[in-house]
Each structure stands twice: as C-alpha cells, then as structure tokens.
Amino acid sequence: MSIVTVQLGQCGNQIGFEVFDALFRDSHCSQGLCSKRDNEAYQASCRERFFREEENGVPVARAVLVDMEPKVINQTLSKAAQSGRWNYGQHTSFCQKQGSGNNWAYGYSVHGPKHEESIMNLIQTEVEKCDSLSGFFIIMSMAGGTGSGLGAFVTQKLQDQYSSSLKMNQIIWPYGTGEVIVQNYNSILTLSHLYRSSDALLIHENDAVHKICAKRMNIKQISFRDLNQVLAHQLGSVFQPTYSEDSSFHYRRNPLGDLMEHLVPHPEFKMLGVRNIPQMSAASLAYSAFTWAGLLKHLRQMLISSAKMEEGINWQVRPPLTGLPPIGKASAHKEHHFNTSLANLVVLRGREVHSADVEGFKDPALYTSWLEPVDAFSVWKTQRAFDKYEKSAALVSNSQLLVKPLDMIVGKAWNMFSSKAFIHQYTKFGMEEEDFLDSFALLEQVVASYGSLGP
C-alpha cells in the first residue's frame, strides 16, 4: 500500500527531500546481509510505498509540495532532479509569492481557504496514482506560519475528504530558546488543531536533533541540512520495509495502519516520539562494533529515563516495583523521573536480527496498568541492514516523553496570552480569544491524560 507525503512550508519541503533521498539511497545500496531475492523484495516494497514509476524509468516520489513562497520549492525540485536517482513529479507542487510571516492565523485563515481547491486537487491527483492508499504522511513545522497554520488547515481538509484514510503528521518542535517570538502561540494552535484531525503526531524536537548532530555525529558547524538528514535517518529506520508478523519472507503491506494499530490505542493519546541507535559519524562507525544485547539495553534505558540519545543516559532511573515509587522519583531533577509508556514499537534491522532478545521491553512495569504488555509492545524485524549500520534499532514510543516540553510550551504561551501580548496579530485575521482558550483547554487535558499514565 502507498503513502502520499504532503510537504508543507520551508521546513516540510527541506525535510521531505532528505527523507525521500534517504529512503532511495538505502533501498538501492548494496547489502551483503540478505539474499538478492530478499533485497529485490525490499526495494519493491519501498518503491510501492513511497515512489511511482514514470515513463522514463526514474522513480517519482509520491509527494505534494506546498509553500507560500517559491524559493524553497524550486530548490527542492532542483535538488531532486540533480540527484539523478529519483525525482518529484510534474505538476505536484503549489507555491505563491507571499509567505505567512510566521503568523499562524494568516496561514490557517487566509492562505488555507484561498488556496484550498488548488492544493486538494494536487493531492487528489497523487492519490489517484496509488493502486491502494495506506494514508497520508504530512511533514510540517509547529512554530512558523505556512507549515503550521496552513498545515493544520490542510490536515483538517484531508480528514474531511479522506476520513477513512490514516493521517500521520511529522512535526518539528521548535528550539526551546526560540526562533520566533510568537512560536509558543503558533505551537499550541498547531497541536490543538492537529489533535482533532490527525491520527498520530510523530514529533521531533529541534534541541534533541541538534544534540545528536553535535555529540554523536561530531559536526562542528551544524546546518539545517545536517538536522534534516538525522531526521530522515530516523524516519527511514521506522518506515523502510520490515517482515510481516506471520512471515520472515514477506514484507508488511500497510506500515501506517500497522503502526497506528500498535501505538495509538486511544484517541486521547496521539503523541509519538522516536529514538534511534546507533547514530554516529562514518569515522566513528569504522571503529565500532555492536551487539543486540548492548543496543537494546541502551535503547530500553533511553526509554525509561526519557533520554534523547545514547550519550548522557541516566542509568539511575529504574522501573517501579509493585506498590513502590520508581527509583529516581525522589530526584530533585524532574527530567530524571521514570517515563511510563502506553505503547512501544521496536524496529530491528541487520545481522542476526532473529537472535535479538526484546524481553526487557515486555516488562509490565514499563507500561500503564490498563494495558497488558502483550498489547502494549510490538517488534518489527528484517535481517536487511539499514543505511551503513550492520545492526540498528529504532523505538517509536507513545509515552510521557513529550509531557514536559508540552507543559512548558503551554505555560509560556499562557503567560503571553494572559498579558494579551501579540493577540492582535491573530485577531486581525479572524481568530478570536476563544480560539486560544479552546487550544489551551485541549492541550492541558492532553498533559493531564499523559500524566495519569503512571508515576
């Protein structure tokens, strides 16, 4: 089944390019860890999901590109064409001459209704080229104007027109120090609207990705492309083909559906975080060796301690014993608290994958009391390695990972709202203060719901 990707705004289009490039490079790199037949099946499965064939034989991304300024879209189309490996389709992009000026209301209330027909027609055309549609993957920022405001509008229209198709939004959480003065307003408006219209929110924090670039990739001058390539690697490690539940010879057909079924058991809980190991520079990788036991030990501790990467994991945090608070709970540092999960998916790729022991992720102490571990944990596998790593593991977690950053962003936005700061920038484009209050109420309920999962 195929996935149609919608790239929105500067952030969405730049990340979208890196995602398709990473998917294509991985599926076409030489692999010595599986048979030629298995490798060809892997390539075919990737192609069905993310690409379609054009008459000239060059794979074309199943994507629609949207921005309110032409510069980034033109650059993105050009880079894909110049790669010589794959391309975007003709007539799959929409852009205008005027951006949204980091104003969520302008993207949502002005650009959205004005360009709805053109954008939705492009998406419909792409959908009609799929033999079978798994759903939509919408890549956007959370804090700007076009990606966030228009992105929320487009997601709502996708829900209206394709209510039976799955919608996953991949969202970039802004730097905590702030790129835009109104980013907290934009963020709460984006999240609250997506919570009503999307099936799942796959969230990446800029601060965390930046640390991976600096600490794990050893990059000195970190660019947006560096950040986007780390994001693309993490997304590829989740969405590239894996074996179906009942066979080690056939790849699963419906990755979005399978992922949602495992990870989003209740509409109150839609926030997913991704962790991936190992991630390191090519120079470091040349001198590194990995065991499944070591990788999974680190990944499990990253989960329960809310660590963003392998470096700096707090090994003091332990799951709670029955009837007792978790070790680490009494810490003065709130980030050291035990992270309770609703559901987890581990994706394993590489040599000897069937020998990997994931029993540590089935511990009932990791999960909220109202779900059995058999329902809360899933593992996907393939012996085909991903990218340049002989062994790699990814974790997609529906847990309390994002409660603290969400609570902080709601608090900052409320402080601004209570003093009526910058509200006029939104009300002049048709928004009312009641819209803000609705957003606050919804997100405060999300924080409370995740907080109720466990200790």
UniProtKB/Swiss-Prot annotation:
Localisation per UniProt entry: Cell projection, Cilium; Cytoplasm, Cytoskeleton, Microtubule organizing center, Centrosome, Centriole; Cytoplasm; Nucleus
Residues involved in GTP binding: A143, G144, G145, T146, G147, S148, G149
Keywords: Cell projection, Cilium biogenesis/degradation, Cytoplasm, Cytoskeleton, Developmental protein, GTP-binding, Microtubule, Nucleotide-binding, Nucleus
Tissue distribution: Highly expressed in testis.
Gene Ontology terms describing biological process: cell projection organization; microtubule-based process; positive regulation of smoothened signaling pathway
Record-linked Pfam families: Tubulin (PF00091)
InterPro entries (UniProt xref): Delta_tubulin, Tub_FtsZ_C, Tubulin, Tubulin/FtsZ_GTPase_sf, Tubulin_C, Tubulin_CS, Tubulin_FtsZ_GTPase
SMART domains on file: Tubulin
A single GO cellular-component term on record: centriole
MF term (GO), any: GTP binding
Known function: Acts as a positive regulator of hedgehog signaling and regulates ciliary function.
Self-association state and partner proteins as the record states: Found in a complex with TEDC1, TEDC2, TUBE1 and TUBD1.
Family statement drawn from the similarity comment of this UniProt entry: Belongs to the tubulin family.
Descriptive protein name: Tubulin delta chain
